[in-house]
C-alpha cells in the first residue's frame, strides 16, 4: 500500500529547525508495521536533514558551517535579484538535499536515539514550506 499526503510547515526563521514532531503530527495514522517514509520539500532554498536532536548547539553550528561553505555577496553570483541570501540558499539546498527516506519499523519511524528530522531554512524570510510525505508499506 502507498499513501501520500501534502502539508505545510509553519514559517521558520533562517537556521536549522527540529521538525520531527511537526512531521509526525501530519502523517496519516496508523503507520504501517514495516515500510518507508519519503519526505520531499517543494522548495529550492531550504533542505531536509537528519541530525542530532538533543543539543541545540548542533543546529546553530550547522548554520555556521553552511554559511562558511557558501557565502553571501560573492562577486561571481549572477542570480542576485531576489536578495543576497537567495543564490546561496539555492546552493545550500542542493548540497543538503530536498528529500529523506526513513525506515518504518513496528509502526514507528526507525530513527536512532539522538536523530531528529530538520528543516534547514536558508532564506532570511523563507515563509511556510510544503512537504510531500509518501508512505510505502
Regions found by a protein language model. Name each.
Residues 1-137:
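Active-site histidine-anchored catalytic micro-motif
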Amino acid at each position: 500500500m502507498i499513501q501520500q499526503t501534502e502539508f505545510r510547515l509553519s514559517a521558520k526563521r533562517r537556521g536549522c529547525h527540529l521538525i520531527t514532531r511537526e512531521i509526525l503530527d501530519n502523517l496519516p495514522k496508523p503507520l504501517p508495521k514495516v515500510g518507508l517514509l519519503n519526505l520531499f520539500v517543494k522548495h529550492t532554498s531550504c533542505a531536509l536533514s537528519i541530525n542530532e536532536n538533543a543539543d541545540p548547539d548542533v543546529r546553530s553550528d550547522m548554520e555556521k558551517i553552511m554559511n562558511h561553505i557558501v557565502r553571501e555577496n560573492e562577486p561571481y553570483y549572477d542570480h542576485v535579484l531576489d536578495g543576497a541570501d537567495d543564490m546561496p540558499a539555492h546552493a545550500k539546498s542542493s548540497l543538503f538535499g530536498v528529500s529523506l527516506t526513513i525506515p518504518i519499523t513496528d509502526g514507528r519511524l526507525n530513527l536512532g536515539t539522538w536523530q531528529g528530522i530538520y528543516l534547514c531554512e536558508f532564506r532570511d524570510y523563507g515563509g511556510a514550506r510544503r512537504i510531500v510525505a509518501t508512505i510505502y508499506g
